[in-house]
Amino acid sequence: MSDPLTAMNISREALSRASVLVVGDVMLDRYWYGEVDRISPEAPVPIVRITREEERNGGAANVAYNVVTLGARSSLLTVVGDDEASHKLEALVLGTGISAYFGRDPDLKTTVKLRVIGRQQQLLRLDFENTPRNEVLASQSAVFSSLLPDHQAVLFSDYGKGGLAHVADMIARARDAGKQILIDPKGSDFSRYRNASVITPNRVELRQVIGSWLDESDLQAKCQSLRQQLGLDAVLLTRSEEGMTLFDAEGQLHVNTQAREVFDVTGAGDTVIATMATLLAAGLSLRQALPLANRAGGLVVGKFGTAAVTYEELFA
């Protein structure tokens, strides 16, 4: 297989002209780091003495962050609460150069994932969340339409938090506008993603929809059937240590993972789909973008927490 970088001459300038609209569920990723040197007398749990705190973009915000880290432009459309976490998240997003379009629901608690870290490993995660009101979600529809002309690709990042209740309508409008449409899916109902360009489930997510498969031949048959039923251009199955497989009209294309030490898988799927969207927006085909997206996923698992891959790392 030819090197997509050489074949398509993907320069920094080419990526800087690419623009991806990210729509979906955002969250604030909080990390509390501490020292663990004793067990609580109240219960058989470690006592963590917090020494450092950190906050990062999470969910769809991390996807958009991955796009701009590669050197492309990204807009982020989402719904958040009107609380401390949402304002902190907005500041983080704007600080990375992402164009933020935050709809605010005063009844919504902005999703926060708080991870407690001790001895270089995650000890505990606390989630704070609820579901946005339909009226607030509907109000973002006009904003979505106004943003479409300025982007070559639209990426829907579904974390199942309720922010993509109107995704079917948005996909239809993006399709009519001739955009590349990428979906990071959630749940067992993939019919809501009908007519997207590509969906990127992992093995667990795919199994919820098509059931188990006997072998690679059975997997290919089921994925092709799903692709045709939903009118998708492709299904991209991410397979962790087994790499990833693209199922499209040409058949099946598999790329193996690049061997490296896995430090943290948090956000790896975000990096894969963000890289794919960026390269499609820059003019590559799905098959040309696949090896680079796979490489990006392999690089990011060597970093801690929600992270991103730079242009220099990807094209080293």
Residue ranges and their predicted role:
Residues 67, 76, 114, 154-157, ...:
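Buried hydrophobic positions in well-ordered alpha/beta secondary-structure cores of metabolic enzymes
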